């Protein structure tokens, strides 16, 4: 698959397909969106929000969550605020999210089946990494949105004037429901 993508990319560049996407690094709407990496949202999310290339910083991860105050999603939001001029943040989870059903037991079984040893997992635990917490999903989407919004709003590095709001998008219709 990657080779096909590389071939397509050569053609894209040769025909100057990039020209309609040219913009700078600063989001025109001074907006950051934290959302899930679900494939159903790849085109639906920006279309449903009326966003085009250059409008917003879109940060995606499994579940659209901030799981700790200093994880990579939070780092990206801090960079967006201080380096890129973001003034508003939307946390956008979605209906029927697979992260809702993630379980450490499933991941553990799959990792062992694919060659990760118990010794490796023990080493990770001894380094202070809680794989149960890191790989466990959430049980309730609205609660996870509220928790992520609260983590962002109360972060010691997030200025008080930054607007942070939480939503759930219907992964079929694109309809937004404001949670907080």
Please describe what each predicted stretch is:
Residues 1-29, 64-72, 81-84, 99-180:
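Divalent-metal-activated hydrolytic enzyme cores
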Residues 26-40:
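N-terminal low-complexity or amphipathic/hydrophobic leaders
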Residues 46-51:
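Short Gly/aromatic-enriched secondary-structure transition segments
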Residues 57-64:
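A short, structured active-site edge motif that brings together acidic residues
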């Amino acid at each position: 698959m990657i080779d096909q993508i590389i071939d397509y990319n050569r053609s894209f560049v040769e025909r100057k397909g990039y020209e309609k996407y040219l913009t700078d690094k600063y989001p025109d709407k001074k907006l950051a969106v934290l959302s899930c990496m679900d494939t159903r949202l790849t085109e639906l999310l920006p279309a449903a929000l009326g966003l085009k290339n250059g409008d917003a910083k879109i940060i995606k991860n499994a579940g659209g969550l901030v799981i700790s105050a200093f994880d990579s999603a939070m780092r990206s939001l801090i960079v967006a605020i201080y380096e890129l001029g973001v003034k508003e943040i939307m946390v956008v989870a979605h209906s029927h999210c697979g992260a809702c059903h993630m379980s450490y037991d499933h991941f553990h079984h799959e990792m062992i089946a694919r060659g990760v040893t118990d010794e490796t997992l023990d080493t990770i635990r001894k380094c202070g990494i809680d794989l149960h917490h890191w790989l466990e999903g959430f049980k309730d989407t609205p609660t996870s949105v509220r928790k992520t919004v609260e983590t962002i709003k109360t972060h010691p590095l997030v200025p008080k004037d930054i607007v942070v709001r939480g939503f759930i998008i219907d992964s079929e219709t694109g309809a937004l429901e404001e949670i907080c």
